[in-house]
Curated annotation (Swiss-Prot):
This is Toxin GTx1-15. The presence of a 'disulfide through disulfide knot' structurally defines this protein as a knottin. This toxin is amphipathic in nature with a hydrophobic face on one side of the molecule (composed of residues 51-Phe-Met-52 and 73-His--Phe-80) and a hydrophilic (mostly cationic) face on the opposite side (composed of residues 56-Ile--Lys-61 and 64-Arg--Pro-65). The keyword Disulfide bond applies. It comes from Grammostola rosea. InterPro entries: Huwentoxin-1, Huwentoxin_CS1. The keyword Signal applies. PROSITE patterns: HWTX_1.
Amino acid sequence: MKTSVVFVIAGLALLSVACYASELKEQSSINEVLSTIFHFEQPEERDCLGFMRKCIPDNDKCCRPNLVCSRTHKWCKYVFGK
C-alpha cells in the first residue's frame, strides 16, 4: 500500500513537471509570435529636426515635409509650395 502511494505521488510529480515544461515551451512560442507581429522597425539614424530647430544649412536634416534649413537664421522653417 505504501509503495503504491509513493508511485502515485511520483507519477503526479512527473506529470506536473512535464506539463510545466510544455507550458514554458508554448509560452516562449507565443512570445516569439507576438514579438514578430508587433515588431516595429527602428527609426533611421537621420536625426530629423522639427520646426524652428537649430540646423546647419550645408547638412540639411530638416526632413519633415516642406521644412528646409534657413541659410540666414540657421533653423528649420516651412517653405510653402515646395
